[in-house]
Amino acid sequence: MIKIDNVKKFYTDKVKIGPLDIEIPKAGFTSLIGPNGAGKSTTLLMIGRLLDMDEGQIQVANMDVSESKSKDLAKVLTILRQENHFVTRLTVRQLVGFGRFPYSKGRLTKEDEVIISKYIDFLDLTNLENRYLDELSGGQRQRAYVAMVLCQETEYVLLDEPLNNLDVARSVQMMEHLRRAANEFGRTILTVMHDINFAAKYSDKICAMKDGQIAAFGTVEEVMDSTLLTDIFETRIEIIKGPYGPIAVY
């Protein structure tokens, strides 16, 4: 479980995130949605300890994020930021291998190599594993980064806008991979999403944010509400109930 207790982040006297209070259940897929500036990425970065909170406490798997040792936290939690600066002379396999660093400290074992191959195959990268990152398309490179974080084999996986710069087909492919990771590997996946309908189709829970606050948290059916989403996004949003679940029309 990810437990966020009275967490606040201050930027100026007028701009702040929180107080945030939420418990995200273990296993499954949870999406953070909301307009730009709502605090989604800030919240994700605080959970991943890439950004300090000013008040409150965050626990992941009963570990205090602020107090835990990095080497211990790295075996429980991994995070992929929206922007990643890659080394061009790095192959896909070498990149994915970085996911094993918390365990091997750079000295890959035979077991590590098996795990690396597992996630390269899982993300359909086998034919690309010896290609350099600068030879890949944006979608292929994004899959390589996701393979790297999954290769870390942490129970909790945080992803900041994993569909960034992906077209519709590649976005569907990515979401199907992440959904499978939650189902087949029992991962707890928390991701920042801009597309409401992708969040609705693939998530178990949705957390909607506005103005640094949690506006709603619940099942897809609970959050996919016309009145609620219209207020959050400040534009008219209609919800259509269909055979594949609720769809937002705006």
Swiss-Prot record:
Top EC class of this enzyme = translocase
* CDD domains on file: ABC_Iron-Siderophores_B12_Hemin (cd03214)
Q: Which family does it belong to?
A: Belongs to the ABC transporter superfamily.
* Gene3D superfamilies tied to this protein: P-loop containing nucleotide triphosphate hydrolases
**The protein's name in its UniProt record:** Petrobactin import ATP-binding protein FatE
The answer on whether this UniProt entry bears the keyword Phosphoprotein reads no
Report the superkingdom from the record: Bacteria
Keywords from the UniProt entry: ATP-binding, Cell membrane, Ion transport, Iron, Iron transport, Membrane, Nucleotide-binding, Translocase, Transport
> InterPro entries, alphabetically?
AAA+_ATPase, ABC_transporter-like_ATP-bd, P-loop_NTPase, Siderophore_ABC-ATPase
Instruction: State the function annotated in the UniProt record.
Output: Part of an ABC transporter complex involved in ferric-petrobactin uptake. Probably responsible for energy coupling to the transport system.
> Which PROSITE patterns does the protein's record reference?
ABC_TRANSPORTER_2 (PS50893)
**What is the annotated localization of this protein?**
Cell membrane
Question: Gene symbol?
Answer: fatE
* Annotated signal sequence range: none
Annotated GO CC locations: plasma membrane
* Primary localization class, coarse: membrane
Phenotypic effect of disruption:
A mutant lacking fatE, fpuC and fpuD ATPases is deficient in petrobactin import in iron-depleted conditions.
Gene Ontology MF terms in the entry: ATP binding; ATP hydrolysis activity
Self-association or partners: how does it assemble? The complex is composed of two ATP-binding proteins (FatE), two transmembrane proteins (FatC and FatD) and a solute-binding protein (FpuA).
Upper classification of the organism: Bacteria, Bacillati, Bacillota, Bacilli, Bacillales
